[in-house]
Structures are given as C-alpha cells and as structure tokens.
Amino acid sequence: MMQASITSILVVLTLVAQDRLAGGLEHKSYDYTKYHTMDEISAWMNQMQRENPDVVSTMTYGQTYEKRNITLLKIGFSSTTPKKAIWMDCGIHAREWIAPAFCQHFVKEVLGSYKTDSRVNMLFKNLDFYITPVLNMDGYIYSWLNNSTRLWRKSRSPCHENSTCSGTDLNRNFYANWGMVGISRNCCSEVYNGATALSEPEAEAVTDFLGAHQNHLLCYLTIHSYGQLILVPYGHPNISAPNYDELMEVGLAAAKAIKAVHGKSYKVGSSPDVLYPNSGSSRDFARLIGIPYSFTFELRDEGQHGFILPEDQIQPTCQEAYEGAMSIINYVHDKNFKNTAITVTATLWTTLMALWISTSHVF
C-alpha cells in the first residue's frame, strides 16, 4: 500500500512538472536575460495574466498568415469608461530578437513596480498599455529553426505562383505613402512591400486595431534593432509630421535618459535623416491617422553584432531602452493629465518636506 501511494505521488508530481514545462516556467524562474521561443513567450503572456488578473488581460486582434492568433497584453487598472492608451509592439521583423526581449522586460518592470511606485501607479490609473511582444509570429518562429533561417526578416506568406521566394516586409506594408520610397517590388527582396498595401494579415490586424482605438491612443512605440536610433515620422524625405519639432524634443529627452543608464548614445531624427528613406511603416501610419506621438526605437548595437546581439547585452539594452520609453510615456501622460501630474508632484514634495522636518529635529 505504501509503495502504491509513493508511486501515485510520483506520477502526480511528474504530471505537474510536465504541465509546467508545457505551459512555461514559473514567473520567478523566467530568465529575462535569455532569448525565448514563441511557445515560451506565449506561455509567459498567459502567466502574466494569471499572476496579475487585476491589471492584465489578453486580447486577440487578428491572425498571422499561418493562422496563429496575434495577441497583446492590455495592462492598466480597469475602468468603466474608455481610457487613453499607449501602444507598443515588438518583433515586426523576425530576426530582431532583442525587440521581443524588450517588450517582456518592459512588462516585467511595470508590473513589478506599480504597487510601490506612485508614478507607475498613476500611469496605470490614467492609461492602458497595449503591448504585442511578437507581431510577426510566423517569421519569428521560422528564425528559430536553424542557423540558415536565423536572419529571416519578413513574414511567411507566399509570393506569386512563379516565384520560389516568400515573405513581405511588414514594415513596408502599411497604408502610409505605400510603395513610394525605400521598398522593392521584387518578392525576393528583404524590403518587398507586398502586392498591395495591407496585403498581409498582420499589418491589417494592427491597422484595424488602431482604427478602432485611434481616438484613445496617445502614443505609438514600435521596437526594432539595430542602430541605436529613435526615429520620428515620416520615412518619406519630403514629408514632415506637423508636430516634428515636439517629436524631436521628446525623442532627444528619451535619448538623454537612455545615455544616463549605461552611456550608450542614440541618434534622434526622421528615418531619411539618420537611417534611410522608407514608406509603408507602422510608425508613419500611426501618425497619419492622428496618433500624435509615434516613435521607432532601434535598439543596440551599432553593427558590431547586429541582429545577433549576445545574450549578455539583453539586460543592459532593455534597462536603457526602458528609461527611454518611460521618458516618452511620462511626457505624453503629463501633457494629457496635467492636474494629476501636479497633484502627484505636490504630494511627493509634501512627503519629502515632512521627512526633512522630522529628521532635522533629531539630535
């Protein structure tokens, strides 16, 4: 009987272990200093929701070409009325593994601090965060297959019948000066912009979501690599955003915040000015439909490792980029919620003064 009980317990423990492996490792053991497969990231997303049900929910807003659900994390305190929101997506280009790593880091940081950090708590009260850790899921999975696919960039949709090539550059497929500059009509090219604007279901899904929420979205952040850049609209050299000067000011402040962490310098400007002209980008589309603050982050490095950024650089890259992103988010928040920001600042100063007075009388 004793042997049977021990056997039963071992069976149960084995099943539990297998279930955890299938569903992803526990949050405490999730390694944010490593790159993760799509299955691991999906399990992590579910875990974030399970562990933080008061502030995290998942939303599926489309499917990839290979019929995978495109899912985001909605983060913030619940509200009976629609809230203003921040969008962040990572992994639109498959080979840029540091981008999904950053989205995960960002989520970890805000969820780990909103209960103790009054600033993040205020953001959660006034804003919702829509965060897609991997937009190009098909391409990302393909980039994990082997060394020959590691540098895959595009989606995985097929080209026309007479071509052996596949994939569209999703960041050339949005309806924003589509097909004008910085693209190719050759499907074998890495910057192939698709048969038509929004030919790709991934781009269409984002477009539909932004359209449905455009009156509430204040800021659009799309995370890429590499180059250490903060890019503002637009990718066309002859078109500037109406609030270009303000975007530059906000971007330069973010670059300053980034440099303060590990000393890394980020250039700020439009894509034609600091990188290359392009069209059909998600950043430009977001600005065109009226989302006032739209930025592309190109994370580390400057070409030493390129897309194969070593894992020992994940943490410092994410730490500095987090400060840059929060610099932008705080600016956007404070501009739209001035009274709230003043109240929090006053409360902070009152608390500091009280502490100073109390300690100044201690002899």
From Swiss-Prot:
Main location: membrane
Active site: 298
Recorded GO CC terms: apical plasma membrane; extracellular space; plasma membrane; side of membrane
pH dependence as annotated: Optimum pH is 6.5-7.5.
Record PTM: N-glycosylated.
Glycosylation sites: 69, 147, 162, 238
Xref: SMART domains: Zn_pept
EC number, as in UniProt: 3.4.17.-
Domain of life, source organism: Eukaryota
Membrane topology, from the record: Lipid-anchor; GPI-anchor
Activity regulation statement: Strongly inhibited by potato carboxypeptidase inhibitor, and the chelating agents EDTA and 1,10-phenanthroline. Also inhibited by compounds with multiple carboxylic acid groups such as citrate and succinate, and to a lesser exent the amino acids aspartate and glutamate. Not significantly inhibited by benzylsuccinic acid.
Disulphide bridges, residue numbers: none
Annotated InterPro entries: Carboxypeptidase_O, Peptidase_M14
Ranges where the Peptidase M14 domain occurs: 34-332
Swiss-Prot/TrEMBL keywords: Carboxypeptidase, Cell membrane, Glycoprotein, GPI-anchor, Hydrolase, Lipoprotein, Membrane, Metal-binding, Metalloprotease, Protease, Signal, Zinc
UniProt note on tissues of expression: Expressed in intestinal epithelium.
Lipidation (GPI-anchor amidated asparagine): 339
GO molecular function, one term: zinc ion binding
Maturation-removed propeptide residues: 340-363
Function description: Carboxypeptidase which preferentially cleaves C-terminal acidic residues from peptides and proteins. Can also cleave C-terminal hydrophobic amino acids, with a preference for small residues over large residues.
Recorded family membership: Belongs to the peptidase M14 family.
The protein's name in its UniProt record: Carboxypeptidase O
Species name: Danio rerio (Zebrafish)
Gene label: cpo
